[in-house]
Amino acid sequence: MQCIPKKTFMAMLRIPEVRSNLAAYLRTALMVQEVKNHDDMVHLKALSSEENEDFEICIPGGTYLELFRNPVLRSHLSAMERSYKFPGRFLSEEVDSRDLIPESEKRSLATLAKNGDLPITIQERESDNDDEEKRSASSSDNVGSLHELFDEVSYRRRTPEIYDYLTEQDPEVLEYSPDKRNVGSLARDFALPTGRRHIASVARDHGLPSGKRNVGSLARQSMLPLSGKRNVASLARYYMLPQSGKRNVAALARDSSLPYGKRYLGSLARSGSYPTRDYDEGKRSIASLARSGDWPSVAKRGRMTSGRIMARVLNRRYGRSLSDDREAPSEPLDLQQLIRQGNSEGKENEWQATPFTVSEDLDEGKAKNRSNRRIEASQTRHKRQIDFSDEYPLPVMQNNMLDYEDMMEAIADHYPNAEKRFMGQTVSQPPLRVFRRVLFSYLDVMSTVFCRTCNQVEPHLLQTEKIYHIYVCQYQQIYQPHHVKDNPNTNEPTTMYNHYVQKKCSPMSSSSTHGIITVVRENPADGSSSNYTPDASTRSLRPIFTPKTRYLQSLHGDCRHGFKRFLLLPDIDNFLRTSNSHIAPRSM
């Protein structure tokens, strides 16, 4: 018999499931009249008595199990037992096993687990020996199992603190039985061995061997196995790549870590590191091959180049450096002509190599080059002879005092060779009027110098005028201005030698000058020439000459400024041909 206080039993009757089960049980007991013990009916009739509140109601074990088979009812009953703390006891220690556990009741593990009748406690789980003894117990020992069941209930009555606390905090705890052993029930009842054990809870509680172990946490804490982050960008930033730094082509080229250094075309050309074969060395452009004679041995249409042609190329190539003379041959090297010549020597349908001796051809070409490279002094240079001859065969005039013989020689030669010498563009001859104005400007200056000496003419000045007289004659012979007509703006004739003006310095006579072109001044129409002083200005007798070239400077001012450099050199025609010189007449 299971005895419970009347107050607790009345509270349980308020539950619809208990009330319906108890009413069905009472109807069955009254109708069948099969009550084995008269005391049972006495105790059941006492339910309607309200005399004593402390009266205990005892229910047979079979009825108790039948009433509270539902797990929800059992949870309510256990909660009420913990709340009211009533001691449960058996009125009769001798309980018939047939009343408690019928023979027809199933004892499978699933049924016991579903009904919450598994005889497992926390103490028994912690003790391995007790667990083994419990598992080895005989299933037919129903009395022992019942004792263990009620011992568990009594244990929970002795230790109700945690359940009382949970009941006060959360009334829904009463809906769950603590006898359930699934993981969810154990987790809700905090019955797990050391709390919740899934990875997230362990990681939050820092229960992992070394904290959180995911890749993000390890990367943030620099706890990756190989010193920090291991992606390619991080390794490249920290120079931790396996091959000592960044391995892209640009980085290897900057660090000169390529197997053969830098391999682009410019570097190969500067270092001469082209892929060499048996015939190519250094630069491979057509101009380089033509200069060095390193044509490949294969010609057009798969034919082989004649050996004699290559020997001639070698003669042309090495003959210049083997000779003692530093002058180049007089004729340029024409490889195409040599190839055509060698092709004509062979057969028409066949290209065959002609046997030759390189040493004989080299000796022959060397002797021929020595004889051809001797250039006379009067012969001009070719374009490819710049490095093997002097820049100017004639002396450069650096002062005003010209040697008469040198000047005559330069004028007589006048560069008769028609080959190209200067890199500039060839221009046409200057007009005669331009040359005439420049010459008259110079003679005007010379006349001022004559007047300044007061009847004393220095010999070198006379010689200088003679030189320019000769140069005027040479100009007439070279350019032959046969199309020159009289200038309509002036009354000057076309002939230069008829410009005579009245001469002031009387000691100068035509017999003493011997054909020197003299410039004298006429008396003005309203007076004599006595107004002309030795220091008179010559601005009225010469035009303004304003060139942009610094080699042609006109003499401005009086003759007391001295005789500056204004000599007509042999190359004056080159200066006069330029468009930078502008001659403008000045009014008197």
From Swiss-Prot:
The modification Threonine amide is found at T194. Residues 115-143, 342-382 are annotated as: Disordered. Keywords: Amidation, Cleavage on pair of basic residues, Neuropeptide, Secreted. Residues 1-179, 285-299, 321-588 form a propeptide. GO terms for cellular component: extracellular region. It is found in: Secreted. It comes from the Eukaryota. The modification Tyrosine amide is found at Y260, Y318. This is Neuropeptide-like 1.
